[in-house]
Amino acid sequence: MIWKRSAVLRFYSVCGLLLQGSQGQFPLTQNVTVVEGGTAILTCRVDQNDNTSLQWSNPAQQTLYFDDKKALRDNRIELVRASWHELSISVSDVSLSDEGQYTCSLFTMPVKTSKAYLTVLGVPEKPQISGFSSPVMEGDLMQLTCKTSGSKPAADIRWFKNDKEIKDVKYLKEEDANRKTFTVSSTLDFRVDRSDDGVAVICRVDHESLNATPQVAMQVLEIHYTPSVKIIPSTPFPQEGQPLILTCESKGKPLPEPVLWTKDGGELPDPDRMVVSGRELNILFLNKTDNGTYRCEATNTIGQSSAEYVLIVHDVPNTLLPTTIIPSLTTATVTTTVAITTSPTTSATTSSIRDPNALAGQNGPDHALIGGIVAVVVFVTLCSIFLLGRYLARHKGTYLTNEAKGAEDAPDADTAIINAEGSQVNAEEKKEYFI
């Protein structure tokens, strides 16, 4: 009886150990994603294994490897590692047909399995842009289509103009004939203008198989447009006697032909003085007859455009002496005049002398100097009149000749009595002069 109880206990102990061991013997796998044409690594691990065999099989339930023994003749499939705890194999040059569920089997009682799904990404082809025919005229409607095939899952298409993304452009995806990959297309519509000339329109394909390097296609636009014309003067304030250059700045595609210059609707009136060189009109020296409207015309195969410039020739401003110099001229003139009153014979020469410092750098008539000279002449005249009057006043009186001696009312025959000064205090005092 005791022996039977002991046997039963041993049986349950063995069953418990087997159950515990079988719970630790469970294969572990992971799903794998690989780009078409790449290499996939399939790994199966067992934490606790009592020398039980491991096996990998493909979605068609074909055995690939049984422990370290290769079962399927496929040169793309190689053994990476084989042990009681791990069985790893590699599949190179993966194709879309390799995608599916792979099984790792642990041959215990019962057999335990673990699934690993192999996902193969289809790489999109390089995109192509169609719909552009050069050249395009300004104002036309442009329609560009970008298409790419072979992506799995379907790729995304984005549009850019000079690296600036164009938002909200729709795209269409279609399943390919193999029912595994997709063809994606997108159409961009916009109306072109001259600012679009030379712009690079880019179609970019984004896909998880491309990592950080997207597929791109580029189309550089060529837009033809009529010329734009602008006249630029060499000076904003043209003056009489100065040269003037008018530059006709014209832009267009195709490049405009040589520009045409006209004045007031006709030809240039003075070709010798108005020289056209390329896009420039050079007026050698300006005068009042040059006033008018100058027109520059530029023409290309698309059309014609023009610009106008109204020329007004301004007078050269008079260069006058500063007002602070005039008092110094007057002072110098007065000083010279004092010398003239003591030497009348030198008056003509002295009055014509000009102050060289005051007149330095003057080309026109000096009105200030003329006014100073007039003032000197007037001053000299007034001084002469004053001296003459004083002289006559001093010699005022009555004079008698020898013939008047016999007169009855004559005081003395040999004496002439002259009144010295009418304004003196002693009016009776007389002086005698002999003639």
Swiss-Prot record:
Pfam families: C2-set_2, Ig_3, V-set. Glycans are attached at residues 31, 51, 291. GO terms for biological process: homophilic cell adhesion via plasma membrane adhesion molecules. Residues 27-119 form the Ig-like V-type domain. Residues 389-435 are cytoplasmic. Its main location: membrane. Keywords: Cell adhesion, Cell membrane, Cell projection, Disulfide bond, Glycoprotein, Immunoglobulin domain, Membrane, Phosphoprotein, Repeat, Signal, Synapse, Transmembrane, Transmembrane helix. Residues 1-24 form the signal peptide. Disulfide bonds join 44-104, 146-203, 248-296. Residues 127-219, 227-312 form the Ig-like C2-type domain. The keyword Membrane applies. GO terms for cellular component: axon; neuronal cell body membrane; plasma membrane; synapse. Gene3D superfamilies: Immunoglobulins (2.60.40.10). The modification Phosphoserine is found at residue 423. The keyword Iron does not apply. InterPro entries: CD80_C2-set, Ig-like_dom, Ig-like_dom_sf, Ig-like_fold, Ig_sub, Ig_sub2, Ig_V-set, Neurexin-like. The chain crosses the membrane at residues 368-388. It is found in: Cell membrane; Synapse; Cell projection, Axon. It comes from the Eukaryota. It is a single-pass type I membrane protein. Residues 25-367 are extracellular. Belongs to the nectin family. Adhesion molecule that engages in homo- and heterophilic interactions with the other nectin-like family members, leading to cell aggregation. Important for synapse organization, providing regulated trans-synaptic adhesion. Preferentially binds to oligodendrocytes. This is Cell adhesion molecule 2. It comes from Homo sapiens (Human). The gene is CADM2.
